[in-house]
């Protein structure tokens, strides 16, 4: 079964210039914050690092990908953020080397160290980006892919979806050993 999307899913309000390079990474940052809460580690996080890969890295500054992830990590919503507040938020991060994570707690954040532009591509998709949260006793990493139109996916979800489609196409799977066992009485293979 294919997922249906409406015109409201495709046409989004958000800061540009590119839904794949700006809105997608921003939404990925929001999802990462939710994961930190779900994992129960949000309040323990002392640092966040962002790795941009492939196309997001190569055109990231020109398409404001770096700004988008900072705004997303700051808890700003791309649909409702006052446009005139964006430059102030970014300037504050630059000047103080701190980020207000999820608009709830301040952590150290140095743009030059904590946003990494990797020239290599991740194998799954050209627009990959990874967030790593560091906290006392560990780290939590999550990789997202901006697939266009502001849509963001995780590789695990796509793989699970592909497996489900295969299962539907072949509802009665059979392996080689079972096939050999079934064909033995007739000696036909």
Label each PLM-derived region with a short phrase.
Residues 44-81, 93:
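A structural-propensity feature for long, helix-poor, extended segments
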Residues 11-29:
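Conserved phosphate/anionic-ligand binding catalytic regions in large, soluble enzymes, centered on
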Residues 1-14, 50-52:
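Short, hydrophobic/aliphatic alpha-helical segments
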Residues 93-166, 172:
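Hydrophobic alpha-helical hairpins/lids featuring a short glycine-rich hinge
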Residues 4-8, 42-48, 66, 126-128, ...:
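Short coil/turn connectors at secondary-structure junctions
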Residues 76-88, 98-102:
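Ordered, amphipathic secondary-structure segments that act as subunit-interaction surfaces
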Residues 180-189:
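Single conserved hydrophobic/aromatic residue that forms the stacking wall/gate
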């Amino acid at each position: 079964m294919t997922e249906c999307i409406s015109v409201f899913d495709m046409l989004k309000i958000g800061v540009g210039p590119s839904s794949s390079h700006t809105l997608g990474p921003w939404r990925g940052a929001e999802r990462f914050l939710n994961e930190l809460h779900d994992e129960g580690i949000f309040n323990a996080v002392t640092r966040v690092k962002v790795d941009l890969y492939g196309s997001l890295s190569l055109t990231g500054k020109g398409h404001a990908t770096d700004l988008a992830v900072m705004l997303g990590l700051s808890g700003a919503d791309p649909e409702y953020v006052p446009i005139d507040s964006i430059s102030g938020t970014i300037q504050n991060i630059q000047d103080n080397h701190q980020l207000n994570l999820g608009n709830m707690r301040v952590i150290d954040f140095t743009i030059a160290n904590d946003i990494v532009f990797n020239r290599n591509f991740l194998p799954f998709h050209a627009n990959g980006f990874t967030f790593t949260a560091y906290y006392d006793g560990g780290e939590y990493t999550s990789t997202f892919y901006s697939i266009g139109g502001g849509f963001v996916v995780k590789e695990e979800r796509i793989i699970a979806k592909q497996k489900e489609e295969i299962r539907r196409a072949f509802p009665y799977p059979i392996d080689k050993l079972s096939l050999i066992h079934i064909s033995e009485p007739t000696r036909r293979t």
